[in-house]
Each structure stands twice: as structure tokens, then as C-alpha cells.
């Protein structure tokens, strides 16, 4: 990937970069830079999205073009801006939509993409808007990465972005947090507890860092299989993002939703998000999931 000079500058947050992209003179120029940013975003977030391979549209290998019927390299208006192959071999076609003022892309704009990417396992809409068409939530194969995801990116991400687009090691500025003293005490007591008991419970107040404390406990125990249960999709996303960012050993995850209507009434709970806004692959086939989690013999 050859990155534009605009991306090679050092930014501190997404609004600053977004403003710079908005200042470009044409919609095509803005779209091109956003596609480059999206490619870099996925490259930095490979653990989060379980990415084995990623290609911008022009670089998609012929074997994948043929397998997923994405047209040839000269077919530039296919609606698919890039392709991801996950660690477990799933295919994700993605399309980038940048709009000044964070205007939501229309249903008509997205239907061509959904049509052209229909032979992939998933279609992911990447947009700088707060939402896309509600019809996207009707299909469990649709994923979304939106403005809220970009707004939450921290300084460390943009340090990595700067290194990546300037051909440096994107991980050289990676910062791994260390537990506070009270978290060290929690970790120690949990390890001692599990040495003599099969069950335990940690009760801690909000804001005490339970998400990362749980990760450090898992790493200290050298656990091979972890079941994480959450009451909302947004909490699943929050935990997955934190663990993917801070895990010192790469891990594979499997997101399971109770059913495909779990987020059908999210207007009643402003704190939650739709399943598609989880942004990662997931499924509802419980029997298969139980098989995956069952210990293998031999």
C-alpha cells in the first residue's frame, strides 16, 4: 500500500484526521484517503478482527476474485474496496464511505456493495457516520465500523498509524499497561483461590479496571479456554477491544449472540449497540460453538 502524504502526518485523534480529509478538494480524493486509512486501521487492528490476509481492491488475488466473484482488476466500480481473510478462513468484503459532516450513506449507496459482496461470508461497511441504513441490521452477515469506533481511537493508535504509513515498525511504540497495586492484589488472591477451589468471584466497583484485571488473571493462569458472558453487545465489544489491544499472547475468539433479534429493541437501551455494530464475525449456531469449545482428545 502506498499512502498519501496527508496520512503521513502525525495526528493525535480521529477528528483531526477527519477534518484534514474533509479539506481535500474532491469526493474522489477524500474517498481514496479514507480507503488508505481503513486499510491501515485493519492492519493495526489485526488481532481485534482476527485478520490473516488483507487486500485493497486493486491487490485482491485472482484466486479470491474468482472464488468470491468480485470481477477482474479492471472492474474498479465493483462496490468492494477491499477483502479480508480471517484466521479461520472466513471472507469479509469491505466498503469505505466517507462523507463530510458525517452524513449517513443511503440504502441505495449500500445495496450495490451488498450485491457485489454477496458471495463473501460477510460484508463490512466502514463509514465515518454514526449510523447506516437500519436495513443493514436485518442480515447477520453485515458488519459495521462507524464514527464511534474511530472517535475512540487513542494517541497510541495514531502513533502506530504514523509509523506504519511512514514505513516504520508500527508496533515499536506499543504500550502494555501494568496493573496498579490493588489490581496486583486481586490477581494474587484469585490465583491463590483457584489453587484450592473450582469457583470464585471478584467484586469490584465501577472504574477499577475489571476488564484488564480479568485479562491479567487469564494470562497469569495460562488459561487455554475462557468463557466470557456479558449482558450487552456493547460490553462484549468493549472487552474484546481492550483484550485485543493489551493481550501479550495472540488469542482466538468466538462471539456468540443469543439469537439474531438480540438487538432488535436497542432504542429501549441507549447504552447498547446493534449486533452488526459489534464489527466482528459472530454466529448463532450454538451446536457448532459447543463442538468448538469441547476439549479435543489426543
Where are these regions (language model features)?
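SF2 helicase/translocase NTPase motor core
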Residues: 2-14, 22-23, 27-29, 56-73, ...
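Short linear interaction motifs
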Residues: 19-24, 79
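Catalytic centers of nucleases
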Residues: 29-118
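Structural motif
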Residues: 97-98, 126-130
